[in-house]
Amino acid sequence: MTLPLLGPMTLSGFAHSWFFLFLLVVAGLIAIYVVLQLARQKRMLRFANMELLESVAPQRPSRYRHIPAMLLALSLVLFTVAMAGPTHDVRIPRNRAVVMLVIDVSQSMRATDVEPNRMVAAQEAAKQFADELTPGINLGLIAYAGTATVLVSPTTNREATKAALDKLQFADRTATGEAIFTALQAIATVGAVIGGGDTPPPARIVLFSDGKETMPTNPDNPKGAYTAARTAKDQGVPISTISFGTPYGFVEINDQRQPVPVDDETMKKVAQLSGGNSYNAATLAELNSVYVSLQQQIGYETIRGDASMGWLRLGALVLVAAALAALLINRRLPT
């Protein structure tokens, strides 16, 4: 929970929970206050002449006189929570990660069911994704059809990726499995040289395609897409798949209309086997939306951050309120 002016306030993930022992001190102070109030009442009742007492103190103490003490005790409780060091989830930009953008450039990408065609729309959306991805992430690019080619090794130079995207060319057949294996090899290579940690950097493959794998025809083949997806999971590299297009796409090949419907099921299976997520998009706007979602997932990591300042600020406000209440109600600070 985040409150205006106060900041994040949680009651979980305490870094120094032993500070809650201070609540015993607060409880002791409350007990002393109650005992003093009872003793005060007993002293007042010792007056033998009640009429004289009422003439001397005609106004009975206000029932609100305990509010300052209550606020003071509450402020001590709030300060105790702050000292215990609560934490909350904080999203911070990644500065050590690898993302391989793997794009299908097979002939089916000529289909115009997405204006102006699937390839051009894919290029524009991918360039926007590259621009908006967290600057510290190493982004690589692979184009694949019958074979897979690393066009850009993972780098933080976004201009190199965008320039390569502009040069994508169509080719025959679709070897999705080979593309995934090639991406895994590129990730392993760059992971061996990237410093900044005792373990390889986190990595992800973003696979963009519109149709079924044709080389090999069986995705469970040793070089098939499903086999590659299982290998990716074993290496801790999830695959986010994007199936792009509509069921009504077609291309003209040798003056014949060839249907090229989008294949969502294969892409979903690849994502599932790798431990990643699958997306589908039928328009450029939907594709951009998918890339924005991926950018939020890939570009940031969640860590536990300090949430004590909110409790400190609230405790200070309550303490000030206790002092003001004492001056207004009892005409003195609480004792």
Swiss-Prot record:
Where does this polypeptide localize? Cell membrane
Keywords from the named record: Cell membrane, Membrane, Transmembrane, Transmembrane helix
- One matching Pfam family: VWA_2
Membrane-crossing residue ranges in chain numbering: 18-38, 67-87, 309-329
Query: Which family does this protein fall into?
Result: Belongs to the UPF0353 family.
Q: Which PANTHER family match?
A: LEUCINE ZIPPER PROTEIN 4 (PTHR22550:SF5), SPORE GERMINATION PROTEIN (PTHR22550)
What protein am I looking at?
UPF0353 protein MUL_1490
User: Per the UniProt entry, what species is this protein from, by scientific name?
Assistant: Mycobacterium ulcerans (strain Agy99)
